[in-house]
Amino acid sequence: MKNEINAVLENMTNATPEPEDYTGEDGLLYCGRCRKPKEAYFAPDKAAIFGRDRHPAECDCQRVAREEREAAEKRRRHLDTVEELKRRGFTDPTMRDWTFENDNGRNPQTGIARRYVEHWEDMRTDNIGCLFWGGVGTGKSYLAGCIANALMEKEIPVHMTNFALILNDLAASFENRNEYISRLCRYPLLILDDFGMERGTEYGLEQVFNVIDSRYRSGKPLIVTTNLTLDDLHNPEDTAHSRIYDRLLSMCVPVRFTGDNFRQEAAQRKMESMKKLITD
């Protein structure tokens, strides 16, 4: 055991020389590249403990190499974390491509989405959500996805889903319904896409209210995208819709999306490409 301890101490207190290293006038080992010491003397009381007068020191070359290793490891851990957040946070892999970097810059509401991310801590503290409303294909879901991706790149958990999937999960899951909803509400930001497209059964409306009401009570922000108009939301058809819309409007600031239908444009481009391929 004593020999093993001595071997450990020997490794701890010995600097490993490289061929270009040299011994300086002070008797210490120096790096042959940066000319900085790779050893330092122990204080007298420490020298007595270790049974030798010197210990390894970090030269500039070693420091740079260590910092590069640490930075690479930090980047790897960050990428792993972001990958896991996106795996859990998105219900559709294509949402990973909904980023500000991939944006065509034509949506006038892009600035609002960017500022939401920039001021996320204030949005979170003050529980400020957004209601992206407007016509089909105007970029509501895309910009909501941009917000989700940008926050997850900052290692902030976000979940983006829709009520059709939520209702399917609730119907198929063996998990306690309240626990499922509580899990949704644990995310710092919840994004509900295509609100209003789910089936309007009594059961469905009750679960929609439960999710939105639970989110309201959690005190955490919510972003919703919908093709419904503000007039639809302010003039619900019945009491069941009224209490849902009331909760929603109390949590989310309405942001109107107008302009071109990007989906129609994309479909038109595909059609033109196909015609060109066929006629060439």
Predicted regions and their residues:
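Pre-Walker A (pre-P-loop) alpha-helix and adjacent loop at the N terminus of AAA/AAA+ ATPase modules
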Residues: 88-130
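Walker B catalytic acidic pair
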Residues: 194-195
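Residue-level preference for the first positions of well-ordered beta-strands
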Residues: 127-131, 158, 189, 221
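A short, basic N-terminal segment
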Residues: 1-104, 267-280
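Walker A/P-loop nucleotide-binding motif
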Residues: 124-144
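Short glycine-rich substrate-engagement loop in P-loop NTPases that contacts/grips substrate
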Residues: 108-117, 148-189, 199-206
